Amino acid sequence: MLVTVDDGVALEVVVTGSGPALFLVHGFGGAKEDFSDHIEDLSREYRVVVFDHRGHGESGAPTDEASYSLERLGADILCVADALGVDTFVLLGHSMGGMVARKVALTNPDRIDGLILMDTCHGPIAAVDGDLIEMGAQIALTDGMTTLKEILDAGTPLDNPAYQRLLEERPGYREFQEKKFGSLSAVMWATLVRAIRDQSDDLEAMRSLEMPTLVIVGEVDLPFVSQSRAMADAIPGAVLAVIPDAGHSPQFENADAWAVAVKSFLLASSVS
């Protein structure tokens, strides 16, 4: 279904199951289907909400840069919750979705029953080359997403055996990745990739978080492992789950271990 948020952008939202609300928020360049392997299972006990961020998938794609920021994406989450009549919820954010989730938790802690930060960070990522980010943003805006994809495809493959295994062994996974990229807005890409590069470091502020928190990361997702450990150390009572044989998308790369970590946290936190 479509939910129109407060600035007029329509977001494609899918709700499955009943019970306590659980929002699963995808990352940069992702889609609501990034959690498709787990929705049926989780929806047995939870009201699972997934949606495409603006500029992604089946959601609206504003053409102005002012419509894209990490804070705006956070506002979208709250707008969707309000439209569904959900006062409080567990919030899981993956990658950029985790950056957004941490900001929602910091600014609206009363809305968050539990927080799951997945393969994400507390601030700028040291491994990210700011000049390359700017080059990619300019290419997206001036030459288009097709040209950008050709350049990205010609680059060095990700050093992630788990991801390569998915591409080789999971039927349709490569096509799934291609479809997601094909839906992306150039303005979104350029604006949000800069926002990710320039984000604030919220580690000290995260020490004030009081909701139950799980920090989850694939063991070979090297840009995010150290920041995940730092967040788990900073947030009072936080649990750290390092998923073996997984990189940036452990919900696909080691689905069973990911599901155990998430469901164990939900049960232990009495979010049921």
Where are these regions (language model features)?
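Flexible "cap/lid" loop of the alpha/beta hydrolase fold
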Residues: 102, 106, 113-146
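Short beta-strand/loop motif that positions the catalytic acidic residue
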Residues: 209, 215-217
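Conserved alpha/beta-hydrolase catalytic His-Asp/Glu region
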Residues: 126-130, 145-207
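Conserved HGGG/HGGXW glycine-rich cap/lid loop of the alpha/beta-hydrolase fold
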Residues: 9-62, 66
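Catalytic histidine-centered segment of alpha/beta-hydrolase-like enzymes
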Residues: 246-259
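Conserved acidic catalytic loop of the alpha/beta-hydrolase fold
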Residues: 71-88
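Conserved alpha/beta-hydrolase "acid-adjacent" motif
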Residues: 222-227
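Conserved alpha/beta-hydrolase "nucleophile elbow" surrounding the catalytic nucleophile
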Residues: 26-28, 89, 93-95
